[in-house]
Amino acid sequence: MAWEVQGILSVRQGDGIYLVRQADPAESVQELIKRRQRLPEILEAREAIEVKIASLAAQRRTEEDMDAIDAALDKMAAEVAAGEHGYDGDMTFHAAVTSAARNPILTGLMDLLAESIEETRRESLSQPGRPLLSLASHRSIAKAIRRGDPASAARAARRHITLVADVALLTLESKHGA
């Protein structure tokens, strides 16, 4: 899973595992250590920002915003149904929700964190069964936004970040005290 996140392997459900590039063992170990240290901090930042974004989106969204959110959910569902991880649909969903919040400062913060968020996205969605769970989590957020319920949208976003945070790399750290 970690090698997929690093772009070394490509896993295609039902098709196999493909080598994308050769790994430098020293680089891989160092990157794994850095990632394990960095992920909790990224997830804390995501929770602080994305919970507020979901709440604002529920208050400010338009029908066009809901169309974009629904299209992102459909895209992720199609990717997952095709045996993919749903990376593009996931990214599109978060961008649509951020846009619906109508706050250029928060949009800028999300843009600044984009590379780090991509790291957590790939780590999370590469976990077995995770794409379907993430899609269901996104649907809960979208439902609350559609209802115009900021408190429910915030709770759903917080649950989503908790789901994203449950990754093997961090579980390994807590089990082994590394």
How would you label these PLM feature ranges?
Residues 45-123, 133-140, 152-163:
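Conserved amphipathic alpha-helical segments that form helical-bundle/coiled-coil interaction surfaces
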Residues 150-178:
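C-terminal effector-binding regulatory domain of bacterial HTH transcription factors
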Residues 1-48, 55, 173-178:
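Short linear motifs at protein or domain termini
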